[in-house]
Regions:
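Electropositive polyanion-binding surfaces
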Residues: 1-238
């Protein structure tokens, strides 16, 4: 879609020099896609040390991540393997390979998505807009906070973590380090984000059907069961 105009949810953030959120404002608008960036392309550009948009984005992402860790966030930096089929199509050989490491690019994407989801969770609570919230009301030892890369550490911490749940009441998400968290940034691949985006559009535009909390709660059982099945598949990945 490079060079095309696309509909978007724009969120303008006012941050101080430490990356602390002071104010934000969501709006529906059209944006022109200037370029289709890739993780590898972003990683390579940051590695050059050139001062520019991506360099500043990386610096902000670092501040956002550190602030979350101060709120006891637990970050699992796991490898991202890919399965490659080789040889005879009728009887292929399956090979598991590691994707090229792109930690800076992935940090930018994850931290900016989390910032947006936290902000829209707060917006939903402040405006009385019914939305689906991802919550995890657990208490972890203080030493669990931080970024973990070793498989043994990740396994140990995950075993002490309770699962996150989807609900209609805004509550904390412990391992993300958020007081409220409403997923909105992946409406093309997560049904919860799709529903939340529809709620945002209805509230901001005054058009379309705006569901109340009771109507959303009636969808929760189906959504939660599907999310649990997806989670099982993700946990069993190589």
């Amino acid at each position: 879609n490079e060079g095309q105009d696309r509909p978007a949810l724009l969120i303008t953030f006012d941050l101080d020099s430490d990356g602390t959120l002071r104010a934000f404002a969501p709006e529906l608008s059209w944006v022109r896609v200037t370029a289709n960036l890739t993780y590898i392309g972003v990683e390579n550009e940051i590695a050059t040390g050139a001062q520019g948009m991506l360099h500043h984005a990386r610096d902000l992402a670092r501040m956002l991540r550190q602030a979350r860790i101060c709120e006891h966030a637990v970050i699992m930096d796991q490898p991202d393997p890919r399965m490659v089929l080789k040889g005879d199509p009728a009887n292929p050989e399956v090979e598991v390979v590691q994707s090229e490491s792109t930690p800076e690019a992935q940090m930018i994407v994850s931290e900016f998505m989390i910032l947006a989801n936290k902000a829209m969770g707060s917006w939903a609570r402040e405006t009385g807009t019914a939305m689906l919230f991802r919550t995890q009301n657990i208490t972890l030892p203080a030493e669990s906070a931080g970024v973990w890369t070793e498989p043994t550490d990740i396994y140990r911490i995950i075993n002490n973590m309770g699962p996150s749940i989807l609900e209609c009441e805004p509550r904390r998400h412990a391992t993300i380090g958020a007081k409220v968290y409403a997923p909105v940034t992946s409406p093309l691949r997560r049904y919860s984000d799709f529903i939340n985006m529809a709620q945002i559009m209805a509230r901001l535009s005054g058009q379309g059907r705006l569901l109340d909390q009771g109507e959303l709660e009636s969808l929760l059982q189906l959504l939660s069961s599907r999310a649990e099945l997806v989670g099982q598949v993700q946990r069993m990945r190589p």
